């Protein structure tokens, strides 16, 4: 008599299992994530293999011949920038983003452009073949060389890959796929993990450049087990406000290029178009005669970007002042307010403080500290900062202004866009001022020096 399947409880966040239901997952600590499921029967012959290409024997690293892997340009400059120059044969890319942000549109455009000189396959698990064809027609794409497969069963997809041997494959999306070897429903942790492992293994063995579309949770993280991001070569996040025409792709992980690289796109009626000069867009409505505004030169991968930081400091009307940020770290705001109080003598304990990075950009680097403080100071005093001025620099707890990486590139970008003055860390001053003839550069080593420059400036 066959044994009845055993009931287990599996965490939807980390994939950990337990025999009894608990309110808190014992593996990752998340609450209310354990879901009842049936334990998979133990197979007689193991089906597990490495998702990397099989190794024949142990060999010394010095004896392995390093071969330069050619890249396949996608034809979309901003996407190639994020990927490090194009797609690599055998690489697996995971693209995540909010629903409706434009993931499927971008990938359909990509493989339509690449179909001119290589075999491509678009696997749709969310739309029918007619829906995909209608979208391609609406975007005005030349889809003659694009092969389409509407399928969610992973074994059928593997058979199609062996028969057609495409060079580029898009799987839209990994959460809709399922394997006959797993009893749980599509989208479960075990299904996502197994399907991704099988597709990754096949991509490595056949040299296929594969792009997996991933859903995101309400917190913005890619849905499914964390191992999904570990097994792929590149993780990209599609960001942007759905009420805005601009979208951004950020490389969180990239084995074949620079991480934190950023690509900017504009959504049009004919699909997504790359933006070669995003700083001009982010500063399109910038006015330097308004209090509470300061331009930051931030660095996204190898690209310097000029972003307007807006601050509003106003009298609080409750017992607890509000501290709200959009596109900036809220914890860092609390730290900067304490530094501003201790080292500049400006107390905001009875003030509401609101910060905004214009254009929907998310800024995480400490180089934004100086621009944030100057914007808050300008709003607090209701006086604009000096005209055509930019700022960048990290601020420490003792009020010192620390240097940041790629200072020369940031200054060149500011001068190119017509700015006349820059407040930077003293250690980031250029060795030769003649390299920046149109830019007055003030180096500061403390927060007090920066405050004095703005106070004595033509504000």
Q: What is each model feature region?
A:
Residues 2-13, 17-81, 88-94, 101-111, ...:
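Peripheral, non-AAA+ core regions of ATP-driven protein-machinery
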Residues 120-124:
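Conserved RecA-like ASCE P-loop NTPase motor core of nucleic-acid helicases/translocases
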Residues 98, 125:
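P-loop (Walker A) phosphate-binding loop of NTP-binding proteins
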Residues 129:
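Divalent metal-dependent catalytic cores for phosphoryl transfer on phosphate-bearing substrates
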